[in-house]
């Protein structure tokens, strides 16, 4: 063994042009055979097993195929142009498991050292295993023969340990692949189709960085362009990357796919740390490039949720991309949303500020919302809304929608903190609702639902009434509506709006704001008081007030206080069913009537308009004294 020349036969009845197994020391013989690969096999010769040229070893391997390589084959990959790094697989070669034409299996033990001996062989030879052109490794496979496993053409098997270091060595070869040691058009484990590739082994992240110099190579996971990850993915797709893939993501091109059978131009979720990579790759956060897709079978141009840290990456995203959640324009989140929609995901703390940088309207939230709609915002969205001038508070843009299947142009409830955002969004009502938008409960267009906590402060900054209600709208009032009562009707309702039973602090003072229906609001109280002025009792009280005011002088606070007190006591006694507010309104109307009577009979000289505020204080003091 070990001394068989070309065309010679070893023990075991080998045919012409074949060779038997080599014994110890055959490595030195291989070095002497300059044109032959390591293992002492000459061109067109065969190893153990008695297989002749064009013959096949165990497993029904086809022509042009090769057996598996053992550990250590990684270092051998550095030899020969057009060869593959890790696993010692050359271009269009195959790993273990029934490989097809032009494929090659893994090399045997010690093949790394043999590869260095094969460096002088002509290009197109294989590194690991020391096999010359068209030669075969262990198992006695002749030229054009294949290793175990039955893989299809242009495919390749998995690489052994240490393939990461080999990938770095193979970086100088054009068309080679970094991590996993897979060359272009090669395949990993699992029966992948042509132009696809399997997952990379440990350490592939560092290899991907080394492979960056090769054109057409892929960063994370060691997948080249048009290659595929685990799970039977279609052409132009890619699997998910392992840990550390973030650094490699910078070299990744768009149009690749993740797990789950995604369509062309889509991409799966990234591993930890992908946020930093996304910023370098001009893609959205989560390491997704434009027009790529997340998990769940999303359509073209859609994208899934991003991982942690996507907010910071969004700030560096290219134009037209989405910050919040790493969604680009016209992209989609989980749940099969239609085009132009967007799902939840990555809305966590800090994502709001990123959303303000690149958030576009017309995106959608969870729950199957129609186009131009949007879901609820997460905590912190208030600050983002303030920065996004065109968007309403709560992170909702104009014409966007909240949860619950609302019609277009409507909007759902805002999250906590939306009040401060409403103050910044001049065109939007408090509670994070924009004009013509809708709250929960299936409200019609132009209506709005209840506001969240703190909406009162926002109401003061917006043109709408407190509680986030716009003009001609109505709903239940939230906490804090009293602060806005001065500019609204009772209960914190805006002008021409009506609350239940005239509730809300200061409703009596605001009774003169306008008339409502069904006996609610200031209109009904004023109407009843005006009717009572026509009664004989009211006329008698007005006459008495005129007499007292004329006799005491118009500037006497004590006289005015006495007139008010007498009127209130008499009205309450003659109308026991009236509330305190109704009695006060009636008394003030009668005193106004008395003043008009005095003016109508007086000769008015020069009026001191500057003293108006002074006499207003006199009246106020008189009212306080009366009660």
From Swiss-Prot:
Sequence repeats lie at residues 1-36, 37-79, 80-121, 122-172, 173-213, 214-252, 253-283, 284-317, 318-359, 360-391, 392-428, 429-464, 465-488, 489-515, 516-530. It holds the Pfam family Spidroin_MaSp. Residues 1-530 are annotated as: 15 X approximate tandem repeats. One of its GO terms (cellular component) is extracellular region. It is found in: Secreted, Extracellular space. It comes from the Eukaryota. InterPro entries: Spidroin_C (IPR021001), Spidroin_C_sf (IPR038542). Residues 1-23, 37-70, 82-108, 126-160, 175-201, 216-242, 255-271, 284-307, 320-349, 362-378, 392-415, 429-452 have a biased composition (Gly residues). Gene3D superfamilies: Spidroin domain, C-terminal domain. Belongs to the silk fibroin family. Spiders' major ampullate silk possesses unique characteristics of strength and elasticity. Fibroin consists of pseudocrystalline regions of antiparallel beta-sheet interspersed with elastic amorphous segments. This is Spidroin-2.
